Amino acid sequence: MELFDLPLIWAFIIGFGIIMYVLMDGFDLGVGILFPFAPSEESRDTMMNSVAPVWDGNETWLVLGGAGLLAAFPMVYSIFLPALYIGVFLLLAGLIFRGVAFEFRFKARTSRYLWNWAFAGGSTLAAFAQGAVVGAYIQGFETANGVYVGGALDWLTPFTVLTGLGMLAGYALLGSTWLIMKTEGRLQEWAYRITLPLLAGVLVVFGIISVWTPFVDDLVRGRWFSSLTVIWVLPVLTLLCAFQIFRSVRNRFEGMPFVATMGLFIFTYLGLIVSRWPYVVPPDYTLWDAASAYESQLFLLLGLLFVIPIVLVYTAWTYWVFRGKVRAGEGYH
């Protein structure tokens, strides 16, 4: 007899890991996206130093989410990877370029400009690939008997290009609000100045995606328009977060723009989950269809319940130790 609905528990754990990754690695990817446009080389140093203590720890959540997905829902892996080989490769290549550039830039002198572009390019590529993968998930996958039967480039459509651009804009907004909170002087003023145009861009792209999505998938269209459900609360909350970003930037608040931007991402993410629930491989397979054996999920869950609190405590401790402003000339390398 199964005492717990383990696929549901695992779905919550993996979903939590994904949103933690989006929020925590999103802002340092955003810093990388904004890197070429910084007002000075000194500002770029400060931007890197603002994320230096936390950027590699932020990626822990990607590992946690990916490993959990493989262990708990192997069918998802067996369909997603063949469908998204190129997209996932671009994502990982971007993260690798970003990581290498991060370390080498602090050591380089004559070639620093090359690592500047590698850092920005890797961040941009990783962010775009993440958005395109999300768009491919919304589109759904062509499957037969639990196997992907589509082509290698079926994921790449105008819709996924748009979701990739949306993720770029969203991460750039996270990065600019992070810089407002963590820096001061000329760099902070620059971050204030670009945040509202970035917010406008995010709202425009997200609006187009929201209008387009019901035409991409019948399930989403039916769920959105068959009745006025809780899903319509989420766009309202998202717009309230956008208004709070606008208001707090106009009033020169420092922490609230970043908090409100995280709220914008959270409510958008919840909207995606509610629109697709309970399908993990749309449009055919639910999380119960794709789940591994109950015994496997239970064994792995016991280990994960030990690991997650450690990761949470370490993450909280890191952010507490490195709280406060990062000033020009100060760094952790």
Go through each PLM region and give its residues.
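Membrane-interface helix-loop-helix modules in multi-pass inner-membrane proteins
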Residues: 54-123, 144, 221-229
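N-terminal signal-anchor module of multipass membrane proteins
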Residues: 1-57, 63-65
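Helix-coil boundary and interhelical linker segments in multi-pass alpha-helical membrane proteins
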Residues: 1-14, 68-84, 138-158, 219
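Long, contiguous internal "core" modules enriched in hydrophobic/ aromatic residues
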Residues: 104-254, 271
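Short, membrane-exposed interhelical loops at transmembrane-helix boundaries
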Residues: 281-300
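Juxtamembrane membrane-water interface segments of multi-pass membrane proteins
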Residues: 31-53, 70-76, 103-113, 175-194, ...
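Alpha-helical transmembrane segments
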Residues: 10-21, 79-93, 120-125, 154-168, ...
